[in-house]
Protein backbone atom coordinates (compact mmCIF):
# COMPACT_ATOMS: atom_id res chain seq x y z
CA UNK A 1 0.00 0.00 0.00
CA UNK A 2 1.33 3.41 -0.97
CA UNK A 3 0.51 6.34 1.30
CA UNK A 4 0.65 10.06 0.50
CA UNK A 5 3.90 11.67 1.65
CA UNK A 6 2.06 14.29 3.74
CA UNK A 7 -0.63 13.32 6.22
CA UNK A 8 -2.63 15.71 8.39
CA UNK A 9 -4.50 15.09 11.64
CA UNK A 10 -6.50 18.13 12.75
CA UNK A 11 -9.10 18.82 15.41
CA UNK A 12 -9.73 20.83 18.55
CA UNK A 13 -7.30 20.94 21.45
CA UNK A 14 -7.47 17.92 23.77
CA UNK A 15 -9.31 15.68 21.28
CA UNK A 16 -6.38 13.25 21.04
CA UNK A 17 -4.65 14.42 17.83
CA UNK A 18 -1.11 14.10 19.16
CA UNK A 19 -1.65 10.56 20.45
CA UNK A 20 -3.26 9.38 17.21
CA UNK A 21 -0.65 11.17 15.08
CA UNK A 22 2.30 9.63 16.92
CA UNK A 23 0.83 6.14 16.52
CA UNK A 24 0.16 6.58 12.80
CA UNK A 25 3.55 8.18 12.14
CA UNK A 26 5.37 5.41 14.02
CA UNK A 27 3.47 2.69 12.20
CA UNK A 28 4.22 4.22 8.78
CA UNK A 29 7.77 5.32 9.59
CA UNK A 30 6.87 9.00 9.03
CA UNK A 31 8.18 12.06 10.78
CA UNK A 32 5.65 13.78 13.03
CA UNK A 33 5.38 17.56 13.43
CA UNK A 34 3.08 19.41 15.81
CA UNK A 35 1.80 22.79 14.69
CA UNK A 36 2.32 23.84 18.32
CA UNK A 37 6.06 23.45 17.74
CA UNK A 38 5.85 25.38 14.47
CA UNK A 39 4.08 28.16 16.36
CA UNK A 40 6.88 28.29 18.95
CA UNK A 41 9.47 28.53 16.17
CA UNK A 42 7.56 31.30 14.41
CA UNK A 43 7.14 33.18 17.69
CA UNK A 44 10.90 33.07 18.26
CA UNK A 45 11.65 34.95 15.02
CA UNK A 46 8.75 37.42 14.94
CA UNK A 47 7.52 40.34 17.03
CA UNK A 48 4.23 41.40 18.53
CA UNK A 49 4.07 44.07 15.81
CA UNK A 50 4.35 41.56 12.94
CA UNK A 51 2.49 38.59 14.50
CA UNK A 52 0.29 39.93 17.33
CA UNK A 53 -1.76 36.75 17.86
CA UNK A 54 1.37 34.60 18.09
CA UNK A 55 2.58 36.82 20.93
CA UNK A 56 -0.72 37.08 22.83
CA UNK A 57 0.74 35.25 25.85
CA UNK A 58 4.01 37.20 25.98
CA UNK A 59 4.88 37.97 29.59
CA UNK A 60 1.84 36.09 30.94
CA UNK A 61 1.72 32.64 32.49
CA UNK A 62 -0.42 30.55 30.13
CA UNK A 63 -2.77 29.60 32.97
CA UNK A 64 -3.40 33.26 33.78
CA UNK A 65 -3.81 33.98 30.06
CA UNK A 66 -6.61 31.41 29.74
CA UNK A 67 -8.31 32.43 32.98
CA UNK A 68 -8.09 36.15 32.20
CA UNK A 69 -9.47 36.25 28.66
CA UNK A 70 -13.00 35.83 27.38
CA UNK A 71 -13.81 32.73 25.36
CA UNK A 72 -14.17 34.99 22.29
CA UNK A 73 -10.71 36.51 22.85
CA UNK A 74 -9.17 33.06 23.27
CA UNK A 75 -10.76 31.83 20.05
CA UNK A 76 -9.77 34.99 18.18
CA UNK A 77 -6.16 34.71 19.38
CA UNK A 78 -6.01 31.04 18.42
CA UNK A 79 -7.51 31.52 14.97
CA UNK A 80 -5.35 34.60 14.38
CA UNK A 81 -2.23 32.71 15.40
CA UNK A 82 -3.12 29.92 12.98
CA UNK A 83 -3.51 32.43 10.18
CA UNK A 84 -0.10 33.89 11.01
CA UNK A 85 1.42 30.39 11.03
CA UNK A 86 -0.19 29.10 7.86
CA UNK A 87 2.41 30.27 5.30
CA UNK A 88 5.12 28.37 7.20
CA UNK A 89 2.97 25.27 7.61
CA UNK A 90 2.02 25.25 3.93
CA UNK A 91 5.65 25.71 2.83
CA UNK A 92 6.70 22.73 4.94
CA UNK A 93 3.88 20.57 3.63
CA UNK A 94 4.76 21.40 0.02
CA UNK A 95 8.45 20.67 0.57
CA UNK A 96 7.68 17.28 2.09
CA UNK A 97 5.26 16.44 -0.71
CA UNK A 98 7.74 17.46 -3.42
CA UNK A 99 11.14 16.26 -2.27
CA UNK A 100 11.51 15.62 1.44
CA UNK A 101 10.76 12.64 3.68
CA UNK A 102 7.18 11.56 4.51
CA UNK A 103 5.65 13.43 7.43
CA UNK A 104 2.48 13.72 9.47
CA UNK A 105 1.45 17.20 10.61
CA UNK A 106 -0.88 17.42 13.57
CA UNK A 107 -2.50 20.29 15.36
CA UNK A 108 -5.49 22.51 15.79
CA UNK A 109 -3.93 24.96 13.31
CA UNK A 110 -4.89 22.53 10.53
CA UNK A 111 -8.14 24.27 9.57
CA UNK A 112 -10.20 22.14 7.13
CA UNK A 113 -10.68 24.83 4.46
CA UNK A 114 -6.97 25.67 4.33
CA UNK A 115 -5.94 22.05 3.98
CA UNK A 116 -8.76 21.33 1.49
CA UNK A 117 -7.50 24.15 -0.74
CA UNK A 118 -4.15 22.32 -0.98
CA UNK A 119 -5.77 19.03 -1.99
CA UNK A 120 -6.47 20.51 -5.43
CA UNK A 121 -2.78 20.64 -6.36
CA UNK A 122 -1.07 18.29 -3.89
CA UNK A 123 -1.67 14.67 -4.77
CA UNK A 124 0.71 13.63 -1.96
CA UNK A 125 -1.62 14.95 0.77
CA UNK A 126 -4.32 13.26 2.81
CA UNK A 127 -6.10 14.61 5.89
CA UNK A 128 -8.46 13.63 8.67
CA UNK A 129 -10.04 15.66 11.48
CA UNK A 130 -10.88 14.28 14.88
CA UNK A 131 -13.98 15.59 16.61
CA UNK A 132 -15.58 14.86 19.96
CA UNK A 133 -18.73 15.47 21.93
CA UNK A 134 -18.75 18.37 24.37
CA UNK A 135 -18.80 15.82 27.18
CA UNK A 136 -15.72 14.01 25.92
CA UNK A 137 -13.83 17.29 25.47
CA UNK A 138 -14.70 18.24 29.05
CA UNK A 139 -13.58 14.84 30.32
CA UNK A 140 -10.26 15.15 28.48
CA UNK A 141 -9.63 18.73 29.65
CA UNK A 142 -10.41 17.89 33.27
CA UNK A 143 -8.23 14.78 32.98
CA UNK A 144 -5.23 16.83 31.81
CA UNK A 145 -4.33 17.91 35.34
CA UNK A 146 -0.72 18.76 34.44
CA UNK A 147 -2.08 21.38 32.02
CA UNK A 148 -3.93 23.41 34.64
CA UNK A 149 -1.94 22.45 37.76
CA UNK A 150 -0.60 25.55 39.46
CA UNK A 151 -3.29 27.85 38.08
CA UNK A 152 -4.33 30.48 40.59
CA UNK A 153 -7.95 29.61 39.75
CA UNK A 154 -8.18 26.20 38.11
CA UNK A 155 -11.94 26.30 37.64
CA UNK A 156 -11.79 29.72 35.99
CA UNK A 157 -9.08 28.50 33.65
CA UNK A 158 -11.15 25.45 32.70
CA UNK A 159 -14.29 27.61 32.43
CA UNK A 160 -12.60 29.62 29.65
CA UNK A 161 -10.37 27.01 28.03
CA UNK A 162 -13.05 24.32 27.64
CA UNK A 163 -15.72 26.48 25.91
CA UNK A 164 -13.04 27.79 23.54
CA UNK A 165 -12.25 24.19 22.54
CA UNK A 166 -15.94 23.30 22.22
CA UNK A 167 -16.59 26.34 20.02
CA UNK A 168 -13.58 25.52 17.85
CA UNK A 169 -14.88 21.95 17.48
CA UNK A 170 -18.29 23.29 16.44
CA UNK A 171 -16.84 25.78 13.93
CA UNK A 172 -14.56 23.13 12.47
CA UNK A 173 -17.50 20.80 11.84
CA UNK A 174 -19.68 23.51 10.22
PLM regions with names:
Residues 1-4:
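Phosphate-binding P-loop
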Residues 9:
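Hydrophobic anchor at the beta1->P-loop junction of P-loop NTPases
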Residues 12-15:
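ATP-binding Walker
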Residues 18:
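Walker A/P-loop
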Residues 26-77:
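Conserved substrate/cofactor phosphate-moiety recognition/catalytic segment
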Residues 66-122, 129:
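Glycine-rich phosphate-binding loop used to anchor ATP phosphates in small-molecule kinases
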Residues 122-169:
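A glycine- and Lys/Arg-enriched "phosphate-lid" helix/loop adjacent to the NTP-binding pocket
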Residues 170-174:
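NTP-dependent small-molecule kinase module
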Amino acid sequence: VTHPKVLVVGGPPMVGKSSVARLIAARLGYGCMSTDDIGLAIKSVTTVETHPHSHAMDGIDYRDYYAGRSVEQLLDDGMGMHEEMWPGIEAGMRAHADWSFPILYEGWAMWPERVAALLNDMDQLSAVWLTASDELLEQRVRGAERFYAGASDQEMMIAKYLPRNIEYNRLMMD
